């Protein structure tokens, strides 16, 4: 236990904090005169003032004190900034410890470099205002609020020497994801994982309102934290030296508490038995906009919502410009920097060195630590195939065997985890429980299964937390897979959107190394949620992902189990992408053997010769993307053989949806010649699609004669019904596809009225049978592939 702090040490801490605050204000306001070598003029001030001051002094306070803790105890600490709008504070800290200059040599540690540091902030073609990938030491931008604590816990998993300090703004604490994130402590194994120190910063206000947790009593807040399973430590005040003293002492106590928890767990007699500890949480209460202007134009600013962004605006008013000068001078920069603008040596000595610096922590640049997974060869798990449509299998159950051995092969390296919101078994991935369990540190009943403190499957009924854990795990250099019901992935589609923005920006930062891809398996999908109904039926994530940058977005729709295996192996090997795989879990007919699946998935799209009757030039192309659309297309082919056997039909299956785009638009896109080689230039195309039809039209709109594409897909008709009726009510069924052929092949026009009559008679028969028997007609339920190729 440290005997800190003495008066001299307190003054040094305060000086360092003042230096960070000075650099923070300078970034927000100044474009020149960085060291105040003369009185400020309007020319020294940026013409557009952008940035957030209110949270920044609190961030600088915490960061400064963590530096002291790291320095004293040689700790490995990762800093996660929940209120990411305090970006200038984190840039200031990286500049003070030297990391920023090491990575950006033009921003030197002198007056010229300081001026560049100031000018670039929130400046066109400079750097952004939040704690994005451009900020050394960051894994969390903190723009969209709610995810900081889940990211922090994801980073701590399997990192036993790491402490993740996560600052949570009191505004962010009101979000749903953050509220659920407090439960993450129940999944952290102190014997194997690192520690997370949540730091709840109560500065009282959001943009324009008081924050909830800052206004409740200390007794109520203490009860809340105890109820979540934390041991709360309070530090509060508005007098700097008193706060420095209290915070330093409290952090020493907290570190000793963390060390004690970990020692007890790591040297226990039975390492399999781990009692869930009461982890510490720091609750820090300081004024919003602390050390900034107390009053502006007669209105209180410091300690109020008015300090959230710019305490001083309209600097063309001389009193405001004078107040800015006084504000900057209050930090006494001449006591902090020498005449050349370099931080004084006695202050620079307060920072940790090398990788101990939080801004240089390699865990914040996870690609540096990333090791490839030891992947088994997926061909060893393929479904044996005597021929197309001869055997049935559950695609995700087959994948489960593969994932089991991915997990098994990674047990020693501890760099792979499986995540899901209480759905691993439901999604047929439960073979993984042959080699590991679900993480669980609390009480359990005698008939509970597959629960242990050593488990590597993360399940909590919160898609937000699963996604946040996985992102934190990936960003710190590991691998993972998130399986989720397709409809409920929308709960986190905004998180996925934010991760895409991070990846896009990180790829533009030269010193950032690529991380493992975000791999999402969507199952229990729209066409097989007939038992749960409309609320569980939504394929819309595909539309969202298709809007992302072409060098990030990947959408895969494997038609069967062997294709799913091929796609999954590819995704687990990949780097820097968001891979979404949509696959069913129900028993379905299988189409391609292992070798054919490998070739098909490598191409991403292809003509299925064994299903075609096109004699080189078809009269119609039947295309499909997704397992159920593939089934319905092949069933339509067999019906067409019965009713119009001489029609030349081509079947094209799409696994990689982005192959439909132009090669100039997407790296997986087909050239026009290859596209026309599959779809022709002028023949009608009937496209059965897993998702919303408009997405296909968007992807192919620049292709030859796009108006000839007629797309069937989900049209927002859902119910609790049978699997086939789901296709019927959305006009994706085989009988509708058959009618589409008659309507679009010119020489079949004389038979069109007869075809329509057959269609409506079949629909009436289907509905009556369904109502009477509650199941699909025998000709549907017992259908099998029987067509023989003439190709």
UniProtKB/Swiss-Prot annotation:
EC number annotated for this UniProt entry: 4.1.2.-
Lyase in keyword set: yes
Family annotation (PROSITE patterns): PHOSPHOKETOLASE_1 (PS60002), PHOSPHOKETOLASE_2 (PS60003)
GO MF term (any one): aldehyde-lyase activity
InterPro entries: Phosphoketolase, THDP-binding, Transketo_C/PFOR_II, Xul5P/Fru6P_PKetolase, Xul5P/Fru6P_PKetolase_C, Xul5P/Fru6P_PKetolase_CS, Xul5P/Fru6P_PKetolase_N, Xul5P/Fru6P_PKetolase_ThDP_BS
Annotated GO biological process: carbohydrate metabolic process
Signal peptide: none
Protein name: Probable phosphoketolase
Organism the protein comes from: Pseudomonas putida (strain ATCC 700007 / DSM 6899 / JCM 31910 / BCRC 17059 / LMG 24140 / F1)
